[in-house]
């Protein structure tokens, strides 16, 4: 039972993670451990798109070993239009052929990840449509068997913001997002025995988990951006699974077919995420920054009842309910120093702090319930050093680069193994 719960929970966690749709990040933001923003971070953000200063258009591209990013924004009188794409353009399909003395197998894999966002700005406010598509399909065909696994994940979201509530010392920027995610997983197999007139067995498993999410957030800004500026953020996210029941398994052996259905799967999670960020202009050439972010996540999962189609029991058995609580946090320290008026070095230190986790399992036993609670602190600590530069080639274009160095004995591998990222901005 616990194993089933963990499997269901892990599938749902994949879906939850995907609802926080990838936000474009500049090499400056990455190089300073998430502390210093620039135009590439702001042009598709409903809170800050108005801070991008250009008269005609703004263009941005970022290339790394794993993905490509393209961004473009333009003003049409009082309308602001921003577009953004990120995808794994160079990671496509692969195939492997294996031959043995009595069989031959061919395996093919097709996978890809793509993000596309569209932002409309008007009268200081903004609407942003975000989409995410991920596929990971694999097929293996051999002399006596076929397996076909298909995994797809789609996310659709709408974010509204841009307006602010100001006072003498405080500026409040509220914003909200609603989203819907679809996770489909199917596994088909066909197996034939290695004898004449053998029995053929086929199985078809499926899992469809849909997640509806609502996020309410606000930034509380104070200070002067020319000296000391700080932002306290607070966000609340509610996720719930809908439409996650139905036929999940079908097996055919010879002339006999078995179909299994599921009912009662439930999933709910609440996330509270406070954060704090500051920027300090220590001198004309030196800027210091820092941030800390905390996530408090409470998730309740019930795996539901399964039964053979046509044999649904009059009374469903009582279900086990798993509730997990996780508190995670990370911090970043950043610095930008101008060596020349048009060239600045970025340095950042990023750290993932120990996390607290607790699991409560309520299992029905006869007419009573058994409750088990386990909790503890994961004392593991990880950190990375980040560095890069910004080169303003002229008043219209700039080159932005960073690399990530894990603070482990194999840090050299992290530099040479694909962590280098190059960005290019142009505005006119």
Model feature map: region roles:
Residues 56-57, 77-82, 124-131, 166-176, ...:
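Repeated loop/turn-to-beta-strand initiation elements of outer-membrane beta-barrel proteins
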Residues 389-393, 397, 403, 414-428:
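Outer-membrane beta-barrel "beta-signal"
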Residues 19-86:
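N-terminal, post-signal peptide beta-strand-biased segments of exported outer-membrane/organellar beta-barrel
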Residues 64-68, 108-116, 148-158, 205-214, ...:
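Residues that define the transmembrane beta-barrel architecture of outer-membrane proteins
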Residues 91-110, 139-151, 186-207, 242-267, ...:
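Flexible, solvent-exposed loop segments that connect beta-strands
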Residues 61-65, 85-91, 131-139, 178-188, ...:
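Transmembrane beta-strands of outer-membrane beta-barrel pores
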Residues 69-73, 117-121, 157-164, 215-219, ...:
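Outer-membrane beta-barrel architecture
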Residues 213-359:
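Detector for outer-membrane/organellar transmembrane beta-barrel domains
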């Amino acid at each position: 039972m616990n194993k089933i719960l963990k499997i269901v929970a892990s599938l749902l966690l994949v879906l939850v993670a995907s609802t926080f749709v990838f936000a474009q990040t500049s090499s400056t933001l990455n190089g300073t451990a998430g502390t210093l923003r620039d135009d590439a971070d702001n042009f598709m953000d409903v809170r800050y798109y108005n801070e991008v200063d250009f008269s005609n258009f703004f263009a941005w591209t970022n290339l790394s070993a794993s993905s490509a990013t393209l961004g473009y924004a333009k003003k049409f009188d009082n309308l602001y239009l921003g577009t953004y794409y990120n995808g794994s353009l160079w990671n496509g399909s692969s195939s492997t052929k294996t031959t043995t003395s009595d069989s031959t197998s061919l395996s093919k894999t097709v996978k890809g990840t793509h993000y596309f966002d569209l932002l409309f700005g008007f009268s200081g406010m903004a609407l942003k449509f975000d989409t995410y598509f991920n596929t990971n399909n694999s097929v293996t065909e051999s002399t006596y068997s076929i397996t076909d696994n298909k995994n797809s994940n789609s996310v659709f979201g709408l974010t509204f913001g841009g307006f602010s509530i100001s006072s003498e010392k405080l500026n409040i920027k509220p914003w909200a997002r609603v989203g819907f995610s679809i996770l489909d997983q199917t596994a088909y197999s066909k197996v034939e025995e290695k004898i004449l007139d053998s029995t053929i067995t086929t199985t078809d498993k499926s899992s469809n988990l849909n997640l509806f999410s609502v996020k309410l957030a606000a930034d509380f800004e104070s200070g002067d951006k020319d000296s000391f500026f700080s932002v306290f953020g607070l966000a609340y996210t509610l996720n719930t699974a809908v439409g996650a029941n139905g036929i999940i398994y079908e097996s055919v052996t010879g002339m006999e077919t078995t179909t299994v259905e599921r009912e009662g799967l439930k999933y709910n999670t609440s996330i509270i995420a406070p954060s704090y960020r500051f920027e300090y202009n220590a001198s004309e050439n030196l800027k210091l920054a820092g941030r800390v972010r905390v996530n408090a996540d409470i998730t309740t999962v019930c795996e539901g009842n399964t039964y053979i189609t046509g044999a649904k029991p009059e009374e469903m058995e009582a279900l086990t309910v798993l509730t997990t609580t996780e508190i995670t946090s990370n911090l970043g320290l950043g610095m930008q120093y101008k060596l020349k008026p048009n060239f600045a070095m970025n340095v950042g230190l990023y750290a993932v702090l120990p996390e607290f986790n607790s699991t409560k399992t309520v299992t029905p036993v006869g007419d009573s319930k058994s409750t088990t609670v386990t909790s503890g602190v994961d004392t593991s600590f990880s950190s990375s050093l980040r560095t890069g530069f910004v080169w303003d080639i002229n008043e219209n274009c700039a080159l932005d680069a960073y690399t990530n160095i894990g603070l482990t004995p194999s840090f050299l591998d992290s530099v040479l193994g694909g962590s280098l990222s190059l960005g290019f901005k142009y505005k006119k």
